[in-house]
Amino acid sequence: MNHSDVIKYWFSEKSRQHWFFSTPEIDNEIKQRYEQIWIRAASGELNGWQDSPQGCLALIIVLDQFPLNMFRGTAKSFQTEEMAVEVALKAIKKSYDEILNTDELLFLFMPLMHSENIEHQNIQVKLFEKYDFNDEYSKHHRNIVKRFGRFP
């Protein structure tokens, strides 16, 4: 499996329907298909994916989105969140955000929105504003971290 397989799956019509409203069946499907890829990514084995915009995006999806499905309701769902933030920041530094489409950008920036670091929150709000996205959610996430120092 390569990064293109992750991109094709995540941005398919079927998957799009479950980006923010998953089901136990979808969570299980992702776990069955991608848990071994997640393990490889978590070990650093897939760091070479960072050499391209699509590869970075796929790595972020594997590290940030898939664990939320595969390990829903457990601490393990956040285990690779920091790694996803690092990949996102590197991608932005390489100007990959200027290459990806709108849907892809949303997931490129998502690790920053999930971060409990206020600097990351400020970066994602600026990026949402730069690309003229609906920034209501991005500001809401930042305000929670600003107020509580973390997500309650």
Regions found by a protein language model. Name each.
Residues 1-73, 78-152:
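Intrinsically disordered, low-complexity activation-like regions
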